């Protein structure tokens, strides 16, 4: 049994925190962080929930793919930083999208995406 990815979507929280901003309250600097990680800034949730971001990304993926949420066969969410343990993030996303398919979460840290695809 195989699957096809017809579209992808992404969403980021509105607030971005620079390394310089971090250095105002942490003993660090932009140079120290950037030379070790390559990171200049990161997005942080202030008002958005994981569900909000997952739904926004899913809606974009559905738009790109040209299909309706009612046509989905399965929703798998991979995260280690969910808003809640129960119900699964994927179930909350399915409900907000109006999808009637099975939905569940995979928790495998950085490798989660790969394991979610392998399910």
What are these regions (language model features)?
Residues 1-74, 95-97:
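Conserved "HGTGT" condensation-loop signature of ketosynthase/thiolase-family condensing enzymes
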Residues 36, 40-52, 79-119:
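Conserved catalytic cysteine-centered active-site region
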